[in-house]
């Protein structure tokens, strides 16, 4: 990994500092580490230089009147002074925000602050990694002020009104993501001039996107068609009726059976949705028998969902990847056609004396099964991002940006299997010498739901930015360490999600 150092500048500055010290301009410890004097540093936007008495060094700490003091080991009743520091960064930031713009300095002791911090006041300067037991001087290199938060939380969010914020000697660490598709993001900066000096921003590994389990049950099956009325009955040979089956916005219903009259026999009605095969059965004609209703056709399968593509979105809340598209719902099976009816007879010998002389009704067609639900698309994998910059101006000096691994996209889910079609109703019974009515047709099987597409893989990024200006390149005050991007989630029939990106800086402008 390439690393950038201000080596030659530092040697020249130390020589200059020694000469200036001899003239009594400022103490040597002020120049022993960069404090905004080397190239590429200084207050963003050309603010006035910082007062030497307020800048901690190796030999001397800041003056007590310079700002707010905070230590994680302090008691709960601190007032922000050197003697009684606050014990949370949030309290120190609130206190600093109420001071004059040139007095908004915060001095933080070595230690780990576990809190989610939002910094929204312009002009804040935070000096970390100070040895509180040594008059708030700069601590040794291996002793740091660290800011962390819980899983799936962004430890530090900086929101400005176009003003500047300066952080020095801080280590901001985002924990590995915990929820499915979660991201790990160390810092978000929005509309601010942000200067980072001797800081490390470290994001943990992101989480893989969720893959839904396949459906355990088929879609709702069809309903059996009603039976036709028997011959010689008071029901006048009525055909069977099928109750409609509602499948979301679709409806499937079997055709009504034909009606049996004394001298004629009706034809069954076609099922719905109408197709090529679910016609109604023919009623009895002379010596020819009636016919059963035609079977309903299979419902159309739902279209598969496409795999997720695109970079996703970055906002103050973090990162949101692109999920795979859901598959479309299958269409219901066609209802079976109604069965044809049979004729009655006027002869008293065929039906009871003085009773009805109707023929037998045809059975209703069975309804089709409902179409299967579409498979859910795979969830996008989370991203590991050291710094999100939203329309912010960034300046770095001896900064390390660390990103972990992006999460893999979730797999697309198989669509639900369509419901089975139902049997048609039976034709009505008839006494000897008359024909029974004919049965209704079988309902069609519901179409399968379309399979879901795979989710996008997450990114591994040092800087994710949106809006101007474009952030500096690696070597301009910072080095970067990156993990591997997440793989796209598998879809079906090649509809995989896109693989994530591994980049020093990646723009998300549309």
Model-found features: residue ranges?
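Glycine-centric low-complexity/flexibility signal
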Residues: 178-184, 202-385, 403-461, 482-508
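Right-handed parallel beta-helix
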Residues: 128, 164-174, 193-205, 246, ...
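Right-handed parallel beta-helix/beta-spiral solenoid domain characteristic of secreted/periplasmic
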Residues: 124-180, 185, 205, 216-218
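The right-handed parallel beta-helix/beta-solenoid scaffold, focusing on the short coil/turn
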Residues: 66, 104, 115, 122-124, ...
